[in-house]
Amino acid sequence: MEKFIKHTGVGVPLQRSNVDTDQIIPAVYLKRVTRTGFEDGLFSNWRKNDPDFVLNQDTYKNGSVLIAGPDFGTGSSREHAVWALMDYGFRAVFSSRFADIFRGNSGKAGLLTGIMEQSDIELLWKLMEQTPGLEMTVDLENQTVVAGDTVISFEVDPYIRWRLMEGLDDVGLTLRKVDEIEAYEAKRPAFKPSAL
């Protein structure tokens, strides 16, 4: 997994609340057996049926910082929702509230989910309305988003922050313990199954 320390990209205003995982990626797109290629399913119902949807606007097609309404990622536990956001190019999502399971899945996959006050979300929406295509710099080390002259703090779980800054997914965490695993396996009787 790639380390996340700082990222600069175009902010995308998703001015909707209660966006559940089925809206992020409908179930019809969940039939793949790989973890990639889900970008076509991202918000597909809105992208297909609403020509004015934010991701249908040229200004935001290459956006990588999603500024969403409250209660983002609710509904069923669906890792595919995180993968779709990342495959599309998003590196960070900010909201005033996330579903816990979505936040956990995001952190494990390398997608930052930062929590801001709703008033700060609305301020960023206003700035993006005034300056479409506004670039934002997400600084995970200092837990800030800089948009023009505006600096906004965000919260993130300390453990997820550490994992993102170290670039550690579950496999990476396990590989940090390879010496201990090998020492344990060396002591196990040969007739027992090996973890290596």
Swiss-Prot record:
Protein name, as recorded: 3-isopropylmalate dehydratase small subunit
Biological source species: Corynebacterium efficiens (strain DSM 44549 / YS-314 / AJ 12310 / JCM 11189 / NBRC 100395)
GO cellular component, one term: 3-isopropylmalate dehydratase complex
Function of the molecule: Catalyzes the isomerization between 2-isopropylmalate and 3-isopropylmalate, via the formation of 2-isopropylmaleate.
Organism placement in taxonomy: Bacteria, Bacillati, Actinomycetota, Actinomycetes, Mycobacteriales
GO biological process: L-leucine biosynthetic process
This enzyme's EC code(s): 4.2.1.33
GO molecular function: 3-isopropylmalate dehydratase activity
Keyword Amino-acid biosynthesis attributed: yes
Pathway in which the depicted protein is active: Amino-acid biosynthesis; L-leucine biosynthesis; L-leucine from 3-methyl-2-oxobutanoate: step 2/4
